[in-house]
Curated annotation (Swiss-Prot):
This is Small ribosomal subunit protein uS13. The lineage of its organism: Bacteria, Pseudomonadati, Pseudomonadota, Gammaproteobacteria, Pseudomonadales. It comes from Pseudomonas fluorescens (strain ATCC BAA-477 / NRRL B-23932 / Pf-5). The gene is rpsM. InterPro entries: Rbsml_uS13_C (IPR027437), Ribosomal_uS13 (IPR001892), Ribosomal_uS13-like_H2TH (IPR010979), Ribosomal_uS13_bac-type (IPR019980), Ribosomal_uS13_CS (IPR018269). Residues 93-118 are annotated as: Disordered. Belongs to the universal ribosomal protein uS13 family.
């Protein structure tokens, strides 16, 4: 298994698919990385040379991935909550942030139903 950005990349899959195992790299970004490095997207990781894998590592390093990306997202959410803006309040209360209805649905965000006390 090749190791890129601290993640073990599966050897038996195509390069584009393998790169998506890195948090922050989706299909589109993986295709761009392959295009810039000149690596065949359909080639399997086990068939790539060490030099090609190094090129992939270098190109992936240019993007914000894994722990840095998670930290950045959490800091942005924390900033909203500290500001006390509407979006921050919704995050704090665990409700939908982007204007979805909450009278019905929103069960994933609100959690399991709470019984009515009498």
């Amino acid at each position: 298994m090749a190791r890129i950005a601290g993640v073990n990349i599966p050897d038996n899959k195509h390069t584009v698919i393998s790169l998506t195992y890195i948090y922050g790299v989706g299909r589109t970004t993986a295709q761009k990385i392959c295009a810039v490095t000149g690596v065949n997207p359909a080639a399997k990781i086990k068939d790539l040379s060490d030099e090609q894998i190094e090129q992939l590592r270098g190109e992936v390093a240019k993007f914000t991935t894994e722990g840095d990306l998670r930290r950045e997202i959490n800091m942005k959410i924390k900033r909203l909550m500290d500001l006390g803006c509407y979006r921050g309040l919704r995050h704090r209360r665990g409700l939908p942030v982007r204007g979805q209805r909450t009278k019905t649905n929103a069960r994933t965000r609100k959690g399991p139903r709470k019984p009515i006390r009498k």
